Amino acid sequence: MAKGDKINFSTPSGFPEFLPSEKRLELYLLDIIRRVFESYGFTPIETPAVERLEVLQAKGNQGDNIIYGIDPILPPNRQAEKDKSGETGKDKSGETGSEARALKFDQTVPLAAYIARHLNELIFPFARYQTDMVFRGERAKDGRFRQFRQCDIDVVARRELSLLYDAQMPAIITEIFEAINIGDFLIRINNRKVLTGFFKSVGITEDKIKSCINIVDNLEKIGESKVKQELEKEGVSGEQTQKIIDFIKIDGSVDEVLDKLKHLTLNLPETEQLSLGISELETVIAGVRNLGVTENRFCIDLSIARGLDYYTGTVYETTLLGHEALGSICSGGRYEELVGVFLGEKMPGVGISIGLTRLISRLLKAGILSTLAATPAQVMVVNMQEDLMPTYLKVSQHLRQAGINVITNFDKRPLGKQFQLADKQGIQFCVIIGSEEAAAQKSSLKDLKSGEQVEVLLVNLAEEVKRRLS
């Protein structure tokens, strides 16, 4: 860069940063999410932001179009050394030049690699949660980011994994969103075996089933007419297309949908996989009910497929009622062979994911959530006179030891300006101590919301503040 050139210090497109009030909201929601995850016994882990590219590409090509590749930017002397190291393929750091690296685009594929690396150190079924950042090289637009925080849970087993783990997922989703208090939401549940089995029974060939499922999964985005067109482009006949449309539009209560599915199997050929999917769906639904999730929170939706190739059984999508345009706010499902890519053995798993950065952005824009105060401080001890600073420090520390968040104002300025500063930061209470109050071991406690001001003995100050905060 030439001397005098201006540096563009704006953030790259799609890489968000947060003001204090926004970051505090994210941390508040993270606390709720972690608390619910841990109440079900999920344990935290962290995986690297960077993985070998071959790891991220290990299960199909679902991530190829969104993977961010990276490579170190070496100074000229290091680059020359690396260029000279062509015979060994390594530079002085020991890095192999041919090893392509990339930023993780989700948490599930890195989890599979993590389990493969630590197989003998983990206890199975292994239930973990992560709240890391992920990175996607897709076009940035409103509500979609290239870097965002994703909150995931997964349970993985060595051989068999009970379907009751699948049933826990809607219960966990329900507890989180009820605690956040975002309004009415609906968890839509399906099973990929139901879709795959039905497609087989109406004569869709094996090589076309995945692409047809992906088309059906886009029903809400592109509409029924476009789905029909796309299916016909895949070589699906008009009669088959209509059967598929009629199938994914089956609705009613959970029990009504299950009854309709069972009745359907009586009139179709090759229904073994379809029947297995229905049986799994029944088991999961029974578990969801036993966990206390009410039916206004979940339904069976046969159009839900989840586009990622690795899902093989139960799948979930959650929508906010009245705000369906926001899209899915939590999704996931069961996979059977994802971890086996690295180990060569069947290791079934089930999990869900909340794209927290996207969710916060959407809910703030829709007015469903509001940011928090710019500071966690609940009290400001104002600066009336410099010679009383030792008293202000002692009072501040006494309040902190009582569990109250406190800012001590070290700058001397007019009292009204100090009140304005506290109010601007969202601080509700100011503690005022002048020479007379200090001599009498008293303070004035001012509520900036109501304007009320009361006299309180210093020995009772923490108790009074806590009473008013509650």
Swiss-Prot record:
In terms of Pfam families, this protein maps to:
HGTP_anticodon, tRNA-synt_His
Q: Which family does it belong to?
A: Belongs to the class-II aminoacyl-tRNA synthetase family.
The record's listing under InterPro entries reads: aa-tRNA-synth_II, aa-tRNA-synth_II/BPL/LPL, Anticodon-bd, Anticodon-bd_dom_sf, His-tRNA-ligase, HisRS-like_core, HisRS/HisZ, HisRS_anticodon
Provide the protein name. Answer: Histidine--tRNA ligase
Please give the Gene3D superfamilies that the UniProt record associates with this protein.
Answer: Anticodon-binding domain (3.40.50.800), Bira Bifunctional Protein, Domain 2 (3.30.930.10)
Record has Transmembrane as a keyword: no
Record key words, sorted: Aminoacyl-tRNA synthetase, ATP-binding, Cytoplasm, Ligase, Nucleotide-binding, Protein biosynthesis
HAMAP family with a match to the protein in the record: His_tRNA_synth (MF_00127)
Name the residue ranges with Basic and acidic residues bias: 79-94
User: What does the record give as EC number?
Assistant: 6.1.1.21
Q: Which cysteines are joined by disulfide bonds?
A: none
Checking SUPFAM superfamilies in the record gives: Class II aaRS ABD-related, Class II aaRS and biotin synthetases
Q: Which GO terms describe its biological process?
A: histidyl-tRNA aminoacylation
The gene from which this protein is expressed is hisS
UniProt key word ATP-binding: yes
The record's GO CC annotations read: cytoplasm
Say which enzyme class the record assigns. ligase
Question: Which PROSITE patterns does this UniProt record tie to the protein?
Answer: AA_TRNA_LIGASE_II
Q: Which GO terms describe its molecular function?
A: ATP binding; histidine-tRNA ligase activity
Assembly, in brief, is: Homodimer.
**What is catalyzed by this enzyme?**
tRNA(His) + L-histidine + ATP = L-histidyl-tRNA(His) + AMP + diphosphate + H(+)
Compartmental location? Cytoplasm
In this chain, the stretch annotated as Disordered covers: 69-99
